[in-house]
């Protein structure tokens, strides 16, 4: 398959409609052909390093080494101090991807213009009918996020330039952007209105505009939602908690899985599915004041599981069900598990340790400062491990104790005993790949008696 730009012309995309569960609305996505996807991906790889060198410092979406947690950390830094600005402009770009001006893209995106024009004007087929594309970029193109980011880069400078002073007051007009969601802090409501007008002028040049429904100016005492979190101050104290909308959405997700799907799958699969949801949600919200929310979610999960068990075993009493499927831990907590395997259990969010997220250094570039981002990724992996288990992760340096290879982000890991199964001390525990667990029994039975094997594993872990 040739990816030479000479005589290249993108074929019309295929339009599909998907339901956005979070926003309860339909999304229209145009999907390119396989060859066009390859060409788009090639130019995305070319454009990404360029966009990194020109991006706003406090833009955090769809960028290597940056995340919503970094955006959260900078929002906290902007409003948590006693002398921080108290007025917040919350804004959202209306239909950002669909409305970017093709003329602006052609004039400002530095890749092969002929290929770029072909991407933009490919059109789409829907219901066997061909439609032209006059503006916007398709969500189905991997390059679209980069183009959208570049179209919004420059907002930070526009806001700073509004202050008309030789020494910029960085606390006034503090700007944070995650995709098309924008937060700007201000000392006064009047200056916040001025910032809003400047953003609207900036967007109009690019064919975009702010969403009237989602754009507002609020006082920090009222609080505001951003990226599924609620930020507010009460009696001078700053708080961050999961937003009501995020909690309700997660509760609905759990109910749908436990009640609707729980009857169709095994108990082991049910526990595995619940744990995956809980750990993912807690991993995102553990950087907030989430302890009360975590306890609430634990109660929700227990009540849903009890409701499910009553449906499955209508002839059993509630006490019989609890005695069979719940056991009491040393601290008195009731835990849902397999009756024959108490170690296969539903995790409790109450046990999750809250942490502070160390935000990215703003002037670091992932294409230049690779060592910094590698070390940061390693420290984040350690942070995902709770309590005393961190020392095991550090000891193994992120490598499987069985095979010696590194753990990748998408690989499941398992905690196993190295020697006696009765010894649960940290010194007797190690992490291995889930895929290595099939060899675990044979490995434990040898009790690592082969000195050559022990030395080899130690060498791998120390690499």
What name fits each language-model region?
Residues 3-6, 16, 57-58, 70-202, ...:
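Conserved polymerase palm-domain catalytic core
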Residues 45, 49-61:
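Charged boundary/loop elements
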Residues 300-304, 309-388:
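Extended C-terminal regions of large enzymes
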Residues 375-376, 446-463:
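Acidic, low-complexity intrinsically disordered tails
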Residues 385-391, 418-423:
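Short, intrinsically disordered, charge-biased short linear motifs at domain edges
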Residues 392-397, 425-429:
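Short metal-coordination and nucleic-acid-contact micro-motifs, chiefly zinc-binding Cys/His arrays
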Residues 404-441, 445:
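Histidine-centered nuclease catalytic patch
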């Amino acid at each position: 398959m040739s990816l030479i730009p000479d005589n290249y012309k993108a074929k019309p995309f295929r339009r599909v409609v998907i339901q956005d569960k979070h926003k309860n609305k339909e999304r229209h996505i145009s999907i390119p052909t396989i060859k066009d996807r390859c060409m788009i991906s090639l130019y995305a790889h070319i454009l990404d390093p360029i966009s990194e060198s020109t991006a706003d410092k406090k833009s955090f979406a769809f960028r290597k080494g940056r995340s919503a947690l970094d955006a959260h950390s900078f929002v906290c830094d902007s409003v948590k101090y006693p002398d921080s600005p108290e007025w917040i402009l919350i804004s959202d770009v209306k239909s950002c991807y669909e409305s970017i001006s093709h003329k602006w893209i052609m004039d400002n995106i530095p890749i092969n213009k002929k290929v770029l024009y072909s991407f933009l004007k490919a059109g789409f087929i829907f219901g066997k009918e061909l439609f032209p594309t006059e503006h916007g970029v398709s969500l189905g193109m991997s390059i679209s996020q980069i183009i959208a980011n570049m179209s919004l880069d420059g907002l930070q400078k526009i806001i700073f330039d509004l202050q008309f002073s030789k020494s910029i007051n960085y606390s006034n007009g503090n700007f944070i952007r995650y995709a098309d969601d924008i937060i700007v802090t201000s000392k006064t409501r009047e200056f916040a209105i001025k910032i809003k007008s400047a953003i609207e002028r900036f967007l109009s040049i690019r064919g975009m505009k702010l969403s009237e429904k989602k754009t507002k100016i609020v006082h920090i005492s009222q609080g505001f939602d951003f990226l599924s979190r609620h930020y507010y101050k009460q009696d001078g104290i700053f708080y961050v908690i999961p937003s009501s909308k995020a909690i309700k959405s997660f509760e609905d997700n759990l109910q749908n899985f436990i009640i609707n799907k729980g009857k169709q799958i095994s108990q082991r699969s049910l526990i595995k599915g619940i744990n995956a949801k809980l750990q993912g949600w807690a991993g995102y919200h553990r950087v907030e004041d989430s302890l009360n929310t975590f306890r609430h979610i634990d109660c929700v999960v227990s009540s849903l599981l009890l409701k499910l068990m009553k449906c499955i075993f209508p002839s059993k009493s509630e006490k019989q069900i609890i005695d069979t499927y719940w056991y009491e831990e040393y601290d008195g907590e009731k835990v849902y598990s397999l009756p024959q395997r108490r170690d296969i259990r539903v995790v409790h969010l109450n046990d999750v340790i809250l942490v502070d997220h160390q935000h990215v250094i703003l002037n670091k570039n992932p294409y230049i400062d690779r060592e910094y981002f590698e070390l940061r990724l390693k420290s984040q992996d350690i942070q995902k491990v709770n309590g005393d288990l961190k020392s095991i992760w550090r000891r193994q340096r992120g490598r499987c104790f069985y095979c010696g290879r590194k753990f990748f982000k998408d690989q499941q890991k398992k905690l196993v005993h190295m020697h006696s199964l009765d010894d649960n001390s940290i010194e007797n525990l190690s992490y291995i790949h889930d895929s290595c667990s099939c060899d675990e029994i044979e490995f434990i039975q040898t009790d690592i008696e082969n000195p050559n094997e022990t030395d080899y594993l130690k060498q791998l872990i120390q690499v």
